[in-house]
Amino acid sequence: MISFGGKQLSESNEEIVESLKSLGMTRNLATTIAYLSNVKEASSQEIEMSTGLRQPEVSVAMREMRENSWISVHNEKVTGKGRPTKIYSLTTPFAKIIKHYEEKIREENEARMRIINKLKTLAK
């Protein structure tokens, strides 16, 4: 079970993650989106600690979210030496992310139906 900030993932958020996965989204991406939709912003480390995902899993999810322009990223200087921490926030409304998957699935299904219709024609 996933925990957000030490708390168990709420039943509705768990259902969101499972529903997103059933649309073809990876578990890591679904979990990260569910987490970011519940906070204003978070560092990669905060996401890791709150969701139980490993650093590479969060990085892959963030890359996909950046490619889709669903998040914004800014650097926050840390005290002392070292690289600044990247802070992520979800900038695309959750409904728009769902719309993206709705359109993707619709296109896939239309392509399948064209193949089925072609096969019906060939079978005559």
Where are these regions (language model features)?
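Short, hydrophobic-biased segments on the C-terminal half of alpha helices
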Residues: M62-R63
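Short, cationic-aromatic polyanion-contact patches
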Residues: E18-N28, S43, E76-I98
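Amphipathic alpha-helical dimerization/coiled-coil segments
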Residues: T92-K124
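A short acidic, leucine-rich amphipathic alpha-helix
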Residues: E46-S50
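Short alpha-helical segments that sit at the start of domains
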Residues: F4-A30
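Glycine-centered, phosphate/nucleic-acid-interacting loop/turn motifs that mediate DNA/RNA or nucleotide
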Residues: S69
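Short amphipathic alpha-helical elements of helix-turn-helix/winged-helix folds
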Residues: A34-V39
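Key DNA-contact positions within bacterial/archaeal DNA-binding proteins
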Residues: P56-E57
